[in-house]
Design a protein with these regions (language model features):
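Glycine- and acidic-residue-biased ligand/ion/polar-headgroup-sensing regions
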Residues: 134-137, 143-159, 166
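Short acidic-glycine-tyrosine-enriched beta hairpin
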Residues: 159-179
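A short, N-terminal "cap"/entry segment at the start of jelly-roll beta-barrel domains
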Residues: 74-123
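Conserved short histidine dyad/triad with adjacent acidic residue
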Residues: 112-144, 173-177
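Short alpha-helical interface segments
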Residues: 12-13, 21, 25-89
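Double-stranded beta-helix
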Residues: 191-217
């Protein structure tokens, strides 16, 4: 079970299919790695399907109908689904849901000493990337002007909000400033989804933030 689960409202929107593709990808990876999140999404989808059945049958969707649906679901155990193994060499850590976005892309060195793979999405303005930090290394100190969604796929990292391991999900609000540092051991790999470019707050921020805003870094 994840120590840092995705918020309930995100799981609900994911189950309902109303999340933009970027956040939906992040939640899907969290669900693939965390059995508790997977069970929650399965139950939410079952509730939605059962309520639709009640509506199609012409029944009132009041409290009594909802209680009836929940009573039926309480007797159903949702078993975790085993995911098929990854097939791409060097990416054994990647859940299958991620592989179709990668194609033949490989790691590229980025400013700050980390590596990244940019993931382009059609029709979604979120910026999505895989980041890889070597043990003990960190990202530059930065803050966000909009939400950031992070799901850890390998290793772990620590910042001022806590320690995050495989399957953990983090939501960074715009006011938050942090400096994630990879834990000792293996490299930390995480999927990052941001609504808007980050703002560097360290010594180099004045010079590099314009490049970040224009997507040149």
């Amino acid at each position: 079970m994840s120590r840092h689960p995705a918020p309930d409202e995100l799981l609900l929107d994911y189950a309902a299919g109303v999340l933009p593709e970027g956040p939906a990808l992040a939640v899907s990876l969290h669900v693939a790695l965390d059995p508790a999140a997977r069970r929650a999404v399965d139950r939410l989808r079952a509730v939605g399907g059962a309520l639709l059945e009640e509506e199609e049958a012409g029944l009132e969707l009041g409290d009594a109908a909802l209680e009836s649906v929940m009573a039926r679901l309480d007797g159903v155990a949702v078993e975790p689904k085993a995911a098929p193994p990854a097939r791409r060499p060097g990416f054994e850590w990647a859940p299958p849901a991620l592989l179709r976005y990668l194609g033949g892309k490989d790691w590229k060195r980025a400013f700050g000493g980390f590596e990244q793979i940019e993931i382009g999405l059609h029709g979604d303005t979120h910026r999505v990337a895989l980041l890889r930090l070597q043990p003990g290394k960190g990202l530059p100190v930065h803050r966000h002007v909009a939400n950031e969604f992070t799901v850890v796929l390998q290793g772990g990292y620590t910042d001022n909000t806590g320690n995050y391991g495989v399957g953990d999900f983090a939501v960074g609000p715009g006011a938050q400033q942090h400096e994630p540092i990879a834990d000792p051991g293996e490299p930390c790999i995480a999927l990052i989804v941001v609504e808007k470019p980050i703002v560097l707050t360290g010594a180099w921020g004045r010079w590099l933030n314009p490049l970040l805003r224009w997507g040149w870094m």
